[in-house]
Amino acid sequence: MECKRARAYSSSANLGSGFDILSMAHTAFFDTVEICVETKNSENIVIESNSKIPLEPNRNSATYPLVRIMEERGIKASLRVKVIKGIPEGLGLGSSGASATAAVMAFSSLFNLNLSKEDLVRYAMYGEIASSGSPHPDNVAASVFGGVVSVVSVNPVKVVEIPLNYSFNILLFVPLNVHIEEKTKKAREMVPKTVKLSDYINNSRYISSLLIGFVKGERDLIRLGLNDEIVEKARLPLFPYYPKIKEIAIKYDAVGSCVSGAGPSILVLTDKMTDENKIAEEGTKTCNEFNVECEVIKAKIAGGVEVERRN
């Protein structure tokens, strides 16, 4: 029985004002997907996992992309798919996107499809449909490419890797006792359909500040760019502790802070000027004030999805 296994890292989407556009892959967590071909003359997908995930192929973020690839390319096979979840689900860390990305990469390797990175993103986006009903591309793009990416087009898929000329580390405040049913879907429903022109202009300034800050290596521009006048504000009921954590992060000279994806996790960028211990200590106390138990994770920028070599 031939098998392939791939690993994809967690990610934080939006990065302030870059809703559905920007995302950052990090080493905080990763998902692994192993796909084995049992037979090539029938069509069936059996799912195994260490987590409580849907076992119906069309409802599973790792396997629905495979269903679509097989339909589109006329591939017939009976598959056994093992999804090893390392990324906490529903916490704004790109869990479904990483599973989808790892699955598509393993499948591409198994069937020698040699998919381009853009095609990996295009197919992995189907996993987000299975997860939340919306094919948002930001998390899967980060998990595919690694680093910080900008999705500049969805049809056709076009992703640009953002050069990082400023060295920073990552702190994540990850709530352990917060569970919001269908969180991503609910969070997307909270995004306003119309916005004030002044908010749009401010957000445009933020996103350009962030990108220029990354490219030119300017700390102050990165800090300014990690702000948002629209989506974070609309979703604040999902993470009421965020404003105070951000205030603490800036107080102790973090590069900047924002909500990780749709939340409720919080992303903090740090460097040698930052007092990480104070941010972790006071940020954890803030979580406790809201009856939220937060784990603080230290991470770095991650690379893209890769096929694991078997010993």
Swiss-Prot record:
Catalytic activity: L-homoserine + ATP = O-phospho-L-homoserine + ADP + H(+)
Record PROSITE patterns: GHMP_KINASES_ATP
One Pfam family linked to the record: GHMP_kinases_N
Binding residue positions for ATP: P88, E89, G90, L91, G92, L93, G94, S95, S96, G97, A98
Regions that span the bilayer: none
Any GO CC annotation of this UniProt entry: cytoplasm
InterPro entries: GHMP_kinase_C_dom, GHMP_kinase_C_sf, GHMP_kinase_N_dom, GHMP_knse_ATP-bd_CS, Homoserine_kinase, Ribosomal_Su5_D2-typ_SF, Ribsml_uS5_D2-typ_fold_subgr
Main location: cytoplasm
Recorded superkingdom: Archaea
Record keyword Kinase present: yes
EC number: 2.7.1.39
BP-aspect Gene Ontology terms: threonine biosynthetic process
Enzyme class, spelled out: transferase
Classification via SUPFAM superfamilies: GHMP Kinase, C-terminal domain, Ribosomal protein S5 domain 2-like
Keyword terms, alphabetized: Amino-acid biosynthesis, ATP-binding, Cytoplasm, Kinase, Nucleotide-binding, Threonine biosynthesis, Transferase
Pathway(s): Amino-acid biosynthesis; L-threonine biosynthesis; L-threonine from L-aspartate: step 4/5
Gene Ontology terms for molecular function: ATP binding; homoserine kinase activity
Location relative to the cell: Cytoplasm
Similarity-based family: Belongs to the GHMP kinase family. Homoserine kinase subfamily.
Known role: Catalyzes the ATP-dependent phosphorylation of L-homoserine to L-homoserine phosphate.
Family matches, as PANTHER family: HOMOSERINE KINASE, HOMOSERINE/4-DIPHOSPHOCYTIDYL-2-C-METHYL-D-ERYTHRITOL KINASE
Protein name as annotated: Homoserine kinase
Organism encoding this protein: Saccharolobus islandicus (strain L.S.2.15 / Lassen #1)
